[in-house]
Amino acid sequence: MENKFKRTTVTSALPYANGPVHIGHLAGVYVPADIYVRYLRLKKEDVLFIGGSDEHGVPITIRAKKEGITPQDVVDRYHTLIKESFKEFGISFDIYSRTTSKTHHELASEFFKTLYDKGEFIEKTSMQYYDEEAHQFLADRYITGECPHCHAEGAYGDQCEKCGTSLSPTDLINPKSAISGSKPVMRETKHWYLPLDKHEGWLREWILENHKEWRPNVYGQCKSWLDMGLQPRAVSRDLDWGIPVPVEGAEGKVLYVWFDAPIGYISNTKELLPDSWETWWKDPETRLIHFIGKDNIVFHCIVFPAMLKAEGSYILPDNVPSNEFLNLEGDKISTSRNWAVWLHEYLQDFPGKQDVLRYVLTANAPETKDNDFTWKDFQARNNNELVAVYGNFVNRALVLTHKYFDGKVPVCGELTDYDKETLKEFADVKAEVEKLLDVFKFRDAQKEAMNLARIGNKYLADTEPWKLAKTDMDRVATILNIALQLVANLAIAFEPFLPFSSEKLRKMLNMETFEWDQLGRTDLLAEGHQLNKAELLFEKIEDETIQAQVDKLLATKKANEAANYKANPIKPVIAFEEFEKLDIRVGTVLECEVVPKMKKLLKFKIADGLENRTIVSGIAQHYKPEELVGKQVLFIANLAPRQFKNGLVSEGMILSAENFDGTLAVTSLLREVKPGSEVK
């Protein structure tokens, strides 16, 4: 942090209180923000970490209508769940409040009124979709229809979730109201707009000239918006849920959620510090950092700064370290499709393993490009890195100390050249980790911390103190002293990343606290200092545990496919005479068995009313042979025989229907008929 700043205000994007938090939110915003804040606190710097729930906006009203409850019921439920999940996961907010609070309503209204009185808004009349049955204007998300790009049904008025294209309500083909299902009409409505074009000049200089250090994805997106030319943006909308526009003639209108939500950072600070909140938002010696996902870049880098500048008394953000998106098993995370790993469910399924997820999400952090989370990678990083590297080194160092020195830190004797080389390797770790954290490279910083554990593992493997114990206990003492100093350094280096493990390790080391300035020192544990009992820092995660999570996702995928199933188009019309050429008959299955060395095939002996025939069918993955014996099936009797590589000849084709998920269902009859009966 630059010397000109005395304190840092850190904000993290306010999650919508219309559903739980998932790993995409964590990887994109909350884990990196928490790492950074914990790092600053360890350095004894003055920092404030502000969070809260975004409780206004259309997604909340849509869920409320769907569930037949009020929007307040929705936000009360999810605010509590989100807040408790964050707390259990170790996201260390100084305050986690909400935008339905009295403080927020007052401050957001006051903010709008200040800009209104200063003439910072323009009034515009526009045409907007209106639901005549529900008697209300329709927000973007209240309009659905066919996407003009990929032609998927159910695209929203602001975006198609199938192809990801941003849309306007008027882009949709055959639009309909999500409230009544009726076709909406266009009606005139008046709103207030923030003229971003008026702010384009100073925004261009402030971002493109003064903040070239911002991440390329952030800088690039801002440049793209500025190069296209900024347009006025509505700050109000026709809705009955939100903060009422505080001026005359604004009945039935509320503050647009993008205007309302970022003010929540300020109101939450005011709620926490009613007497000193302005120091954290208006003092030029305060540094403001926004942690967000890439879908919020324009709001935090262009729109919110324009709001703050227009108000006139607030500082502007110094950095906006936005991440890209995290995908799940190769597919985009989607709340509506339930394609996510939900934080509250993870905490239930993996009790005491908060740090494993924190570690994996940081190791796979989408800092400059979209990245992917897979359960197999989660397991591998836990077992091969946390357990086999970090945990293994800590355990060996402590267990050997208890075995040979009754758990007391042994005396460090004369150092060998190898000892000195090892100590030199981790002497610079503080500077390396600091350099990376200061520029928000959390993935590389965590990797640097793990390298410290690798150094320790290699040191013990090379020096083999368990072998020297028979001949040279002085040498063993020196080796274990060095190993323990490395362990203590790991407790500090990993504190911002893995706070639960660092706390557990400090207890094992019998140390209440460490400070960041101590990182890299080789005398953190005094000779003779008594250690506590050694415990495993991490546990191996077994295959069946991971398979249970994979199966849960597969079940979700099948449910989504079933819900979105659309039959294939009908094939070209054929003449009746063409159909008559097919001889479709009923046969009774006399025998059925799997074809040896061809596990997908079943061999049937079919009674067709004239003789018995052999038919081979590729349905072995869908039926057990015994399930089909005695059943009647439909088959094409006049299909040319087909010979397989093993010499087997199939004399027909059994008819099956293919379900949406690829499973096959053999066609059958409602009542039994004579074998050989024709299908007409």
UniProtKB/Swiss-Prot annotation:
<dbReference type="GO" id="GO:0006431">
    <property type="term" value="P:methionyl-tRNA aminoacylation"/>
</dbReference>
<dbReference type="InterPro" id="IPR012340">
    <property type="entry name" value="NA-bd_OB-fold"/>
</dbReference>
<dbReference type="InterPro" id="IPR014729">
    <property type="entry name" value="Rossmann-like_a/b/a_fold"/>
</dbReference>
<dbReference type="InterPro" id="IPR033911">
    <property type="entry name" value="MetRS_core"/>
</dbReference>
<dbReference type="GO" id="GO:0005524">
    <property type="term" value="F:ATP binding"/>
</dbReference>
<dbReference type="Pfam" id="PF01588">
    <property type="entry name" value="tRNA_bind"/>
</dbReference>
<dbReference type="InterPro" id="IPR029038">
    <property type="entry name" value="MetRS_Zn"/>
</dbReference>
<dbReference type="InterPro" id="IPR002547">
    <property type="entry name" value="tRNA-bd_dom"/>
</dbReference>
<dbReference type="GO" id="GO:0004825">
    <property type="term" value="F:methionine-tRNA ligase activity"/>
</dbReference>
<feature type="binding site">
    <location>
        <position position="335"/>
    </location>
    <ligand>
        <name>ATP</name>
    </ligand>
</feature>
<dbReference type="InterPro" id="IPR041872">
    <property type="entry name" value="Anticodon_Met"/>
</dbReference>
<feature type="binding site">
    <location>
        <position position="150"/>
    </location>
    <ligand>
        <name>Zn(2+)</name>
    </ligand>
</feature>
<keyword id="KW-0694">RNA-binding</keyword>
<dbReference type="InterPro" id="IPR023458">
    <property type="entry name" value="Met-tRNA_ligase_1"/>
</dbReference>
<dbReference type="Pfam" id="PF19303">
    <property type="entry name" value="Anticodon_3"/>
</dbReference>
<dbReference type="InterPro" id="IPR014758">
    <property type="entry name" value="Met-tRNA_synth"/>
</dbReference>
<feature type="binding site">
    <location>
        <position position="160"/>
    </location>
    <ligand>
        <name>Zn(2+)</name>
    </ligand>
</feature>
<dbReference type="GO" id="GO:0000049">
    <property type="term" value="F:tRNA binding"/>
</dbReference>
<dbReference type="InterPro" id="IPR009080">
    <property type="entry name" value="tRNAsynth_Ia_anticodon-bd"/>
</dbReference>
<keyword id="KW-0067">ATP-binding</keyword>
<dbReference type="InterPro" id="IPR004495">
    <property type="entry name" value="Met-tRNA-synth_bsu_C"/>
</dbReference>
<feature type="binding site">
    <location>
        <position position="147"/>
    </location>
    <ligand>
        <name>Zn(2+)</name>
    </ligand>
</feature>
<feature type="binding site">
    <location>
        <position position="163"/>
    </location>
    <ligand>
        <name>Zn(2+)</name>
    </ligand>
</feature>
<comment type="subunit">
    <text>Homodimer.</text>
</comment>
<protein>
    <recommendedName>
        <fullName>Methionine--tRNA ligase</fullName>
        <ecNumber>6.1.1.10</ecNumber>
    </recommendedName>
</protein>
<dbReference type="GO" id="GO:0046872">
    <property type="term" value="F:metal ion binding"/>
</dbReference>
<dbReference type="GO" id="GO:0005829">
    <property type="term" value="C:cytosol"/>
</dbReference>
<keyword id="KW-0547">Nucleotide-binding</keyword>
<feature type="short sequence motif" description="'HIGH' region">
    <location>
        <begin position="15"/>
        <end position="25"/>
    </location>
</feature>
<comment type="similarity">
    <text>Belongs to the class-I aminoacyl-tRNA synthetase family. MetG type 1 subfamily.</text>
</comment>
<comment type="function">
    <text>Is required not only for elongation of protein synthesis but also for the initiation of all mRNA translation through initiator tRNA(fMet) aminoacylation.</text>
</comment>
<keyword id="KW-0862">Zinc</keyword>
<keyword id="KW-0030">Aminoacyl-tRNA synthetase</keyword>
<feature type="domain" description="tRNA-binding">
    <location>
        <begin position="578"/>
        <end position="680"/>
    </location>
</feature>
<keyword id="KW-0479">Metal-binding</keyword>
<keyword id="KW-0436">Ligase</keyword>
<keyword id="KW-0963">Cytoplasm</keyword>
<dbReference type="Pfam" id="PF09334">
    <property type="entry name" value="tRNA-synt_1g"/>
</dbReference>
<feature type="short sequence motif" description="'KMSKS' region">
    <location>
        <begin position="332"/>
        <end position="336"/>
    </location>
</feature>
<dbReference type="InterPro" id="IPR001412">
    <property type="entry name" value="aa-tRNA-synth_I_CS"/>
</dbReference>
<keyword id="KW-0820">tRNA-binding</keyword>
<dbReference type="InterPro" id="IPR015413">
    <property type="entry name" value="Methionyl/Leucyl_tRNA_Synth"/>
</dbReference>
